[in-house]
Amino acid sequence: MRYADPSANRDLLGNRTLLFIFICAFALVTLLQQILYSKSYIKRYFEFYKEPLEFNSTRCLELRQEILEVKVLSMVKQSELFERWKSLQICKWAMDASEASLFKSTLSRCCNAPNFLFTTQKNTPVETNLRYEVESSGLYHIDQEIFKMFPKEMPYYRSQFKKCAVVGNGGILKNSGCGKEINSADFVFRCNLPPISGIYTTDVGEKTDVVTVNPSIIIDRFHKLEKWRRPFFSVLQRYENASVLLPAFYNVRNTLVSFRVKYMLDDFQSRQPVYFFHPQYLSSVSRYWLSLGVRARRISTGLILVTAALELCEEVHLFGFWAFPMNPSGFFITHHYYDNVKPKPGFHAMPSEIFTFLRMHSRGILRVHTGTCNCC
């Protein structure tokens, strides 16, 4: 007859007790962490209901530093970045004249938008062999006919405009009510023929001074303007007398279709000017942002326009620039304010670009709008 060993039962009971104590301790620590986090979150949440704080106040300097201490996007979780950005919204943004001036001086040395944003008769004389931005495309010879398409000189000069709005097409603009604030800017840049009339005007405004056109739009939607041209002309008319800007010298594929836009508007006796990005400017801008950590096969049109605006305008405001599937509050949004068509993967580095803008906002160089607007 076998007898159970009482000490074995005691050991088993002791092990279970230790396990129970460990589980309870772990649960208690987790609960305390949640309570402490909740207090911090609640504190930050209620800060949004106070009067806006001055951008250079002690609290705002702390919040700005929380953004600036993140050197690269991979350092923090997306949710943590959003939380830091939301907290900063209690601060009334103000331009830091010293930071902005320093940044603009570096752009002047590297890129020089007032002289090289567009091809002009001054910077691209007749008989020039103009190198494409994509160097493998070779050179384009500027003959007398093409030379006549160029303006005599750049139509804009350094810090010509007091306040500029660069309007991206992000879904963050939907239900923002930012239309009036965008319209109140002295100069407005837009990207790639976005819809601005009807249901969109309240959120995105309608004032447009420069609108870019990606030649792929003309190729895919308007059959290279080889046949019917009026549908494309009608689209451009929505922007009234806005200048039309194209990357004719990015590569060979873009050149002829970009020239056709100029020919078409001349045929219709339109007052809309047509300009072409200078490939030297595009190359310089790409190298500049690469040196600051924006690595992409090609930087976005939005980033190019922001770069130009920083030289041409005293104060730059960004609307519709957001590259995440959720807004800062964690709600899912569409990719564009007018559709949910995603870009080709791996072509642009949009999250990196937006992260760079958030850091520039925190430094007082430009302002990024990601919430609702209460203007005018």
From Swiss-Prot:
Q: Does the keyword rRNA-binding apply?
A: no
Gene Ontology BP term (one): glycosphingolipid biosynthetic process
Any idea where this protein resides?
Answer: Golgi apparatus membrane
Q: List cellular component terms (GO).
A: Golgi membrane
Pathway per the UniProt entry? Protein modification; protein glycosylation
Q: Where are the transmembrane segments?
A: 17-37
Q: What is its EC number?
A: 2.4.99.-
Q: Which GO terms describe its molecular function?
A: alpha-N-acetylneuraminate alpha-2,8-sialyltransferase activity; sialyltransferase activity
State the UniProt keywords alphabetically. Disulfide bond, Glycoprotein, Glycosyltransferase, Golgi apparatus, Lipid metabolism, Membrane, Signal-anchor, Transferase, Transmembrane, Transmembrane helix
Q: How does it sit in the membrane?
A: Single-pass type II membrane protein
For this chain, the annotated S-S bridges are 164-313, 178-373
Q: Tissue specificity, please? A: Expressed in liver.
Q: Which reaction does it catalyse?
A: a ganglioside GT1b (d18:1(4E)) + CMP-N-acetyl-beta-neuraminate = a ganglioside GQ1b (d18:1(4E)) + CMP + H(+); a ganglioside GQ1c (d18:1(4E)) + CMP-N-acetyl-beta-neuraminate = a ganglioside GP1c (d18:1(4E)) + CMP + H(+); a ganglioside GD3 (d18:1(4E)) + CMP-N-acetyl-beta-neuraminate = a ganglioside GT3 (d18:1(4E)) + CMP + H(+); a ganglioside GD1a (d18:1(4E)) + CMP-N-acetyl-beta-neuraminate = a ganglioside GT1a (d18:1(4E)) + CMP + H(+)
| Residues binding substrate, per UniProt | 192, 214-216, 300-302
Pfam families in alphabetical order: Glyco_transf_29
Q: Where is the active site?
A: 348
Report residues carrying sugar chains: 56, 241
Main localisation, per the record? Answer: Golgi
Protein family according to the UniProt entry:
Belongs to the glycosyltransferase 29 family.
What's this protein's function? Involved in the synthesis of gangliosides GD1c, GT1a, GQ1b, GP1c and GT3 from GD1a, GT1b, GM1b and GD3 respectively.
Recorded protein name is Alpha-2,8-sialyltransferase 8E
Q: Which organism is it from?
A: Rattus norvegicus (Rat)
Gene from which the chain derives: St8sia5
